[in-house]
Amino acid sequence: MKATTIIGIAGGSGSGKTTVTNEIMKNLEGHSVALLAQDYYYKDQKHLTFDERLETNYDHPFAFDNDLLIENLKDLKNGKAVEVPTYDYASHTRSDITIDFKPKDVIIVEGIFALENKVLRDMMDVKIYVDTDADLRILRRLTRDTKERGRSMDSVINQYLSVVRPMHDQFIEPTKKYADIIIPEGGSNKVAIDIMTTKIQSLVSKQ
C-alpha cells in the first residue's frame, strides 16, 4: 500500500491558508488528495448549556479535540476509513452529521493550530506556516465574517482586539518555528507556492 503523505498548514486567521491548500491540491493531479480541516474537530459541547457554549474561545488550542484528530489520522495512515466530525456553528457544538473519509495519497491538515500539538506535528511529512501581515489578516476576517457570517463590523473588530490578536500572539505565531516552510505574504506569494508545490510533488512521488 502506498504511504500516506501528511501536510500540515498553519497560520493566523485570514493568512491565506485556504489559498495555499487549494494550490497544493491543484498541483498534485494524479494523486488522491483530501483536506482534513482542523475546524472539523472543535470539541463536543453538548454537556454545556447554550449560554455556556457562547463563552467558548475558538481561538484557543483547548477548543480542539486533537486526540480525535490524531486517532483519525493514524487510522487513515493505516488504510482505514474514518467518520470525521462536523461542527454546528448555530448551536455551538458538534453536529450529529459525520463525513465518511477514506484514505488518500495526500492528506492536508489545515488550521490555525495545525502545528501547535507535538504529537500531531510528528505525524506530518511537511509542515507549512503561512505568514501574513496582521493588518491584511484583520481586513480579510472583516470581509469574511460580515459577508459570509452576517456579523457586524463592530463585533468582528471587538473580537479581534480582545481575543483573536492576543491568542495569535500567544499560541499561533510561536508555532512558526516548527515549520519546514514559511510562506511570506500568504497565498499571494506565487514564487514561494511554486517552489513549495514542486518540493511536495517530489516527496509524494517517492512515497
UniProtKB/Swiss-Prot annotation:
<keyword id="KW-0418">Kinase</keyword>
<comment type="similarity">
    <text>Belongs to the uridine kinase family.</text>
</comment>
<dbReference type="GO" id="GO:0005737">
    <property type="term" value="C:cytoplasm"/>
</dbReference>
<dbReference type="InterPro" id="IPR006083">
    <property type="entry name" value="PRK/URK"/>
</dbReference>
<dbReference type="InterPro" id="IPR026008">
    <property type="entry name" value="Uridine_kinase"/>
</dbReference>
<keyword id="KW-0808">Transferase</keyword>
<keyword id="KW-0547">Nucleotide-binding</keyword>
<dbReference type="GO" id="GO:0044206">
    <property type="term" value="P:UMP salvage"/>
</dbReference>
<keyword id="KW-0963">Cytoplasm</keyword>
<feature type="binding site">
    <location>
        <begin position="11"/>
        <end position="18"/>
    </location>
    <ligand>
        <name>ATP</name>
    </ligand>
</feature>
<dbReference type="GO" id="GO:0005524">
    <property type="term" value="F:ATP binding"/>
</dbReference>
<comment type="pathway">
    <text>Pyrimidine metabolism; CTP biosynthesis via salvage pathway; CTP from cytidine: step 1/3.</text>
</comment>
<dbReference type="GO" id="GO:0044211">
    <property type="term" value="P:CTP salvage"/>
</dbReference>
<dbReference type="GO" id="GO:0004849">
    <property type="term" value="F:uridine kinase activity"/>
</dbReference>
<comment type="pathway">
    <text>Pyrimidine metabolism; UMP biosynthesis via salvage pathway; UMP from uridine: step 1/1.</text>
</comment>
<dbReference type="InterPro" id="IPR000764">
    <property type="entry name" value="Uridine_kinase-like"/>
</dbReference>
<dbReference type="Pfam" id="PF00485">
    <property type="entry name" value="PRK"/>
</dbReference>
<dbReference type="InterPro" id="IPR027417">
    <property type="entry name" value="P-loop_NTPase"/>
</dbReference>
<dbReference type="GO" id="GO:0043771">
    <property type="term" value="F:cytidine kinase activity"/>
</dbReference>
<keyword id="KW-0067">ATP-binding</keyword>
<protein>
    <recommendedName>
        <fullName>Uridine kinase</fullName>
        <ecNumber>2.7.1.48</ecNumber>
    </recommendedName>
</protein>
